[in-house]
């Protein structure tokens, strides 16, 4: 499924509008708040669901080549996180 299609179906707000989500594919989602768990278990093209908001989530997302990150519980990403997300083409919702 295309990430843009998923965004529309789930009514997700893209927090960093500088990334292009029209061509990104999502094959599955993974929910975890432990970075070590995500590194060990998430796969490429997955969508990561978490409450974490610090810049290290972008490093993990880039390392694992994931499609994007959904922040839960009305969590706002740190400005540095969104800046790094734009630099690394990682959508944050």
Where are these regions (language model features)?
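Feature captures the catalytic cores and cofactor-binding loops of soluble hydro-lyases/lyases
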Residues: 21-23, 33-47, 51-93
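Conserved catalytic and cofactor-binding micro-motifs
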Residues: 1-41
């Amino acid at each position: 499924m295309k990430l843009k299609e998923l965004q529309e179906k789930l009514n997700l707000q893209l927090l960093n509008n500088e990334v292009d989500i029209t061509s990104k594919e999502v094959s599955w989602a993974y929910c975890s708040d432990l970075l070590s768990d995500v590194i060990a278990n998430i796969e490429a093209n997955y969508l990561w669901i978490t409450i974490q908001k610090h810049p290290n989530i972008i490093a993990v997302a880039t390392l694992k080549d994931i499609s994007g990150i959904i922040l839960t519980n009305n969590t706002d990403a740190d400005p540095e996180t969104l800046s790094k997300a734009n630099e690394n083409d990682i959508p944050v919702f």
